[in-house]
Amino acid sequence: MRSSMFRCVSRAHYSTSVTEDFINSILARAQEATAKASSNALKLDKMKEGRMQNKRRNGNQNRNSMNNKESRGREGNQGERNMRLKNRSSDSVRANKQQWNKGANTSFVKNPTGNTVVMQPQFKKMQNGKNNLKGDARVEDDLLDVFNSSMEQKPVNFNGTPKSKARFQKKSHILTASKRRKAPQQQLQKVIKRPVSSEYVLEEPTPLSLLEYTPQVFPTKESRLVNFTLDSLKKSNYPIYRSPNLGILKVHDFTLNTPNFGKYTPGSSLIFAKEPQLQNLLIEEDPEDFHRQVTGEYQLLKPYVKKDFEKLTKSKDTVSKLVQNSQVVRLSLQSVVMGSEEKKLVYDVCSGMKPISELQQ
């Protein structure tokens, strides 16, 4: 039974073996497809190179026209730039449309890396978005190139000759300030000079320590005596600084009046007086001045007591106040260089023993 079953199996009417012709045909088709893809990629590269060259030429022409038309305002330059940007954007849009309108079939494009990419029509929208982004990036790059070239290009005169640089270039103080802030600077430390001070230590005074505060001209007894004699001679109108009259006839025997000599007296004329003879002059000496200036003994004023003021008032408070006032006046007047009579009169008036009208007399 089994042998009869196997014998009934029929063979296929075509050959199931793979022939060499079939393999060669497949290889030929694959080679044709790769050749077409490579040729299309080469064409696209050539088109890109041509576009780049055209862009460079247009850019150079536009730059030259911008440099030649510097006298125009900013508005004209801005309009030209806008027109150029519009043209470039329209060119990029047209190129993108041409790429996708050539055929709805799949195409092979080479990347900048050298790999082939299959372009399929179902992903057309995504690819258009990518191309638009690339076009915007190209426009931005072109703008940067134009700006850099305009900055680097030298200024030109109306004749077309390049302008000479100014000798003194104005620099921005803002940049210099920012550079100074960034640069590390050493802070200048102000040296505060303090005065030399030494602590004062109390010491018991000695004759040697007191010599530091003595004047250069020592007030000795002889010097005080000389000063007293000079004062007494001036008071007695003795000729100290003028020639004395010794009784011999002279032409110039008149001198100025001594009280006004060396003093400015407005509203008064100069008085000439005849110099008296030397033998007729009398030198006046005041013994109180002698004791006061030479020996250092001043006039001692008599102090007042309560009994002296009881004649003026009966209240005890006013009497005690008058006594205290008289003591203050006496101590202050004792060391004053004055005449004895004048000093006594001032003492009585200030103490309240005499009226003020006596000072005017």
Curated annotation (Swiss-Prot):
Coiled coil: none
Keyword Mitochondrion: yes
Tagged with keyword Mitochondrion: yes
GO annotation terms (biological process): mitochondrial translation; mitochondrial translational initiation
Region (Disordered): 37-99
Basic and acidic residues composition bias: residue spans: 43-52, 69-91
One GO cellular component term: mitochondrial small ribosomal subunit
Cysteine pairs bridged by disulfides in the record: none
Compartment list: Mitochondrion
Chief place of localization: mitochondrion
GO molecular function: structural constituent of ribosome
Annotated keywords: Mitochondrion, Ribonucleoprotein, Ribosomal protein, Transit peptide
Secretion signal, residue range per the UniProt entry: none
Transit peptide boundaries: 1-14
Record field: compositional bias (Low complexity): 59-68
Record family assignment: Belongs to the mitochondrion-specific ribosomal protein mS46 family.
Function in brief: Component of the mitochondrial ribosome (mitoribosome), a dedicated translation machinery responsible for the synthesis of mitochondrial genome-encoded proteins, including at least some of the essential transmembrane subunits of the mitochondrial respiratory chain. The mitoribosomes are attached to the mitochondrial inner membrane and translation products are cotranslationally integrated into the membrane.
Complexes and interactors: Component of the mitochondrial small ribosomal subunit (mt-SSU). Mature yeast 74S mitochondrial ribosomes consist of a small (37S) and a large (54S) subunit. The 37S small subunit contains a 15S ribosomal RNA (15S mt-rRNA) and 34 different proteins. The 54S large subunit contains a 21S rRNA (21S mt-rRNA) and 46 different proteins.
Name used for this protein in its record: Small ribosomal subunit protein mS46
Organism expressing this protein natively: Saccharomyces cerevisiae (strain ATCC 204508 / S288c)
Phylogenetic classification of the source organism: Eukaryota, Fungi, Dikarya, Ascomycota, Saccharomycotina
Gene that produces this protein: RSM28
